[in-house]
Every structure is written in C-alpha cells, then in structure tokens.
UniProtKB/Swiss-Prot annotation:
Keywords: Chaperone, Cytoplasm, Protein transport, Translocation, Transport. The lineage of its organism: Bacteria, Pseudomonadati, Pseudomonadota, Gammaproteobacteria, Pasteurellales. Its main location: cytoplasm. It comes from Actinobacillus pleuropneumoniae serotype 3 (strain JL03). It comes from the Bacteria. The keyword Transport applies. One of its GO terms (biological process) is protein transport. This is Protein-export protein SecB.
Length: 166
C-alpha cells in the first residue's frame, strides 16, 4: 500500500458520523370528525387505534427525505361510532454522512423518525384539541426497538426461504 493510499484509508476510517437536519415540514395532514356534534352526547369511552410507518427516499448524495406516517383513529366503545380520524405525514430532509449499510438503515429508520415524532405528536394533539375532544397525549415510540424487530423479521423470512440442507 502506498503512502497516499494509507492516508486515504485513514481519512475514511476517521470520517465522523454526521446527521444534520436540513428541513422539517408537514407533508400531509387530515382531521375528520364524521359524527360531530351528536357524538358529544355519548359517554366518552374511547378506543384508540394507532398506526405508524416510515418512508425514506434518497434525494441526492448524503441527502435523504424521511416521512413519518401516523394514523390515529378513535371510536366510542359503546356505540362504535367514529369520534375522529387524524392522519399526519411529518417529513424531514436530512444530510447523513460517514455511515453506510446497516448503520445508514438504522439512522433512517430510527434516529430520523425520533427527530420527527415530537413534531407529529404535537400536531396530532393540537388537531384533536381543535376538534374539542379531550386531550390526546401519544406515548413515546422506541424506534430502535421497532428497527430491531424489523431486522429479526427479515432474518426469519430469509431463514424460512433458505432451502434445507441435509
């Protein structure tokens, strides 16, 4: 290995991980309360539905868009009437340097959604409040655990598809 190659290899090994927020924005939002105002005359025993998903797209070298999709729906336990449905797509553009492969996947699936989630949670809370429903405080989400579950499911699927060796 030449001296120039050694310097380049050392520089690459020492390239620090960098995560920068370029922009955070609302990509899509919807709030529906189809049974207002009659639902206010019913006893408030809500059943909460919560769905969460992420989507990532590479925009340029080291530049990624991450979109956090959250769908919250509430029905009343006794009547089954829908109180409200709130859908939010909270997005951000991030510069990510110094990592690749599984580390990059982890950053996009965990660290970036961790940045976006408080914005989405506050927006959902505000929309529910403006619908004059009781306060809704969504619990924190462990995106690291969700990513690990995803990796385990992927590994299990690959093992199930692999031919048996006798």
């Amino acid at each position: 290995m030449t001296e120039e190659n050694q310097v380049t290899a050392q520089e690459e090994a020492q390239t620090p991980f960098e995560l920068q927020i370029q922009r955070i924005y609302i990509k899509d939002v919807s709030f529906e309360a189809p049974n207002l105002p009659t639902i206010f005359h019913q006893e408030w025993k809500p059943q909460l539905g919560f769905e969460l998903d992420t989507e990532t797209k590479q925009l340029d070298e080291d530049l990624y868009e991450v979109v956090l999709h959250i769908n919250v729906s509430t029905t009343l336990e006794d009547s089954g009437d829908t109180a409200f449905i709130c859908e939010v797509k909270q997005a951000g553009v991030f510069t990510i340097k110094g990592i690749e492969g599984i580390q990059l996947a982890h950053c996009l699936a965990s660290q970036c959604p961790n940045v976006l989630y408080p914005y989405a949670r506050e927006l959902i809370s505000s929309l529910v409040n403006r619908g004059t429903f009781p306060a809704l405080n969504l619990s924190p989400v462990n995106f690291d655990a969700l990513f690990m579950d995803y990796l385990q499911r992927q590994e299990a699927e690959q093992n199930a598809e692999a031919p048996a060796v006798n």
